[in-house]
Amino acid sequence: MPSDADLKRLHWRAHHRGTKEADLLVGGFFDSHHASWGEVERATFAEMLEEQDVDIMAWAHGTAQPPERFEGPMIEALKQLDYIRISR
């Protein structure tokens, strides 16, 4: 089980990316999915947070192929974009 400090660190890093668009995409993805992640998924997400926002957004939109180490269920879930909250 992850420590509270580890989850808070991931939450902060997911929601403070540098642009509002990346904050919504990456932060929204974290909020919607982190509760179901095991240790491997948390480590993969933490590694993904080291990547450039423009790359993560391109993977989510399907305009660029992610590195092989990120391919799989997490990227497929990222591509769904159903976790982004849009203000009305």
Predicted regions and their residues:
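Positively charged, polar, low-complexity stretches
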Residues: 2-88
